[in-house]
């Protein structure tokens, strides 16, 4: 392996790309193979590439006068949140279009979401050694989230509130046990001196950004907390949660040079006792490649929306493209009706309302793009100038 490269697409051919490498000291034209012999097939990326597209070539080899990367990242300055990519991996199928649906729908206030926020507060308190009683923890949480708690319909009934508190108290006990035993005895981490809480990462190399729940200071141990259920049928991690950890591991490996074999990544399902809820996640390269392809599709679609608008996409919105036939009962009973309701709002709107929405969405998409990658006519504009500036 010879390293990582930033390249610009010059020409697109059937089995290779002609690109220009912009790495300092390596400025030259070079061929980039779209397929190799070791399962690296990037032909699905070709429809999204145009002349002058920017690519990051990750973990790249030089073979027979051509570059062969392990991963390709489209427009890497356009950072996509790790959770955005992970949420496209559903039990009914993997589809990058879930990003569009999730972005356009209002964010619901549910007891599950509130429980997740409360569990995060509990983990923070346990790591700092507060050992708070549940009533004290609950009071602090409700004081800081009064509006969300008041407007949550599921907490309007006595039964709903009772179930919420029973679940929350159980999770507090599980988290306390995990910090006092698994974290210290099994992982050999001191809660105060050896860990970072909710560190934020910007990874230009992979075109990703994210915030981990817990990370050791030597970057070798990462723990992501989930207050919801694991896949109780298989007793394994939910697919979207697994993908989230795959991407966090990739950020630590490719961006911070931590070897996969030296890394420990865990999903902490605080709904269950630590003996059953703390799951170790290993790197699966097929998952990682698929996740980066989903990330590239999200970027390509966002860039298209910023120039051409969203109208054509919504006019040809295909619900069946969201599923590959898996979990047919879940699809027909829940996912499909939800998508029909989503697109129905747009299709039943007046022509003037749709026209206004389309124009406003295009404006927002353009502003989002400029905020990310900047304006060519204005030096050091956009968030990407933080790593692209020449000073």
Model-derived regions: residue spans:
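Generic detector of well-ordered secondary structure
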Residues: 121, 247-250, 347
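Metal-dependent nuclease catalytic cores that hydrolyze phosphodiester bonds in DNA/RNA
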Residues: 1-217, 316-325, 331, 340
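Generic detection of long, well-ordered alpha-helical segments
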Residues: 109-116, 161, 165-173, 242, ...
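Metal-dependent nuclease catalytic regions and adjoining charged, substrate-binding loops involved
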Residues: 38-45, 64, 68-82, 169-177, ...
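Accessory interdomain/linker segments of ATP-dependent helicases and helicase-like nucleic-acid enzymes
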Residues: 1-22, 308-391
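Residues that form generic nucleotide/phosphate-binding pockets
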Residues: 88, 122, 178-182, 290, ...
């Amino acid at each position: 392996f010879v390293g990582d490269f930033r390249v610009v697409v010059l020409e697109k051919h059937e089995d290779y790309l002609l690109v220009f490498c912009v790495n300092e000291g390596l400025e030259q034209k070079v061929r980039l193979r779209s397929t190799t012999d070791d399962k690296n097939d990037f032909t699905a990326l070709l429809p999204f590439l145009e002349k002058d597209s920017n690519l990051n070539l990750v973990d790249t080899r030089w073979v027979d006068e051509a570059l062969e990367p392990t991963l390709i990242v489209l427009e890497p300055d356009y950072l996509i949140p790790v959770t955005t990519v992970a949420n496209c991996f559903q039990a009914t199928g993997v589809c990058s279009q879930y990003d569009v649906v999730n972005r356009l729908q209002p964010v619901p206030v549910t007891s599950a979401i509130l429980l997740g926020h409360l569990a995060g507060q509990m983990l923070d308190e346990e790591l700092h050694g507060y050992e708070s009683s549940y009533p004290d923890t609950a009071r602090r949480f409700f004081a800081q989230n009064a509006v969300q708690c008041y407007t949550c319909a599921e907490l309007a009934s006595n039964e709903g509130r009772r179930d919420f508190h029973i679940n929350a108290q159980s999770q507090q006990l599980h988290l306390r046990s995990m910090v006092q035993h698994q974290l210290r005895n099994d992982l050999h981490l001191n809660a105060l001196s050896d860990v970072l809480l909710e560190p934020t990462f910007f990874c230009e190399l992979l075109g990703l950004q994210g915030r981990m729940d817990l990370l050791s200071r030597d970057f070798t141990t990462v723990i992501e907390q989930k207050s919801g259920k694991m896949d109780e049928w298989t007793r394994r991690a939910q697919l979207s949660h697994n993908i989230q950890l795959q991407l966090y591991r990739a950020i630590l490996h490719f961006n911070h040079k931590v070897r996969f074999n030296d890394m420990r990544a865990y999903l902490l399902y605080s709904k269950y006792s630590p003996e059953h809820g703390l799951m170790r996640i290993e790197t699966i390269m097929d998952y990682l490649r698929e996740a980066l392809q989903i990330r590239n599709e999200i970027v390509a679609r966002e860039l298209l929306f910023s120039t051409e608008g969203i109208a054509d996409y919504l006019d040809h919105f295909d619900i069946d493209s969201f599923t590959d036939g898996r979990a047919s009962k879940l699809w027909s009973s829940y996912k499909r009706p939800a998508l029909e309701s989503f697109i129905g709002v747009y299709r039943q709107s007046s022509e003037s309302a749709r026209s206004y929405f389309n124009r406003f969405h295009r404006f927002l998409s353009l502003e989002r793009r400029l905020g990310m990658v900047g304006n060519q006519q204005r030096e050091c504009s956009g968030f990407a100038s933080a790593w692209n500036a020449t000073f």
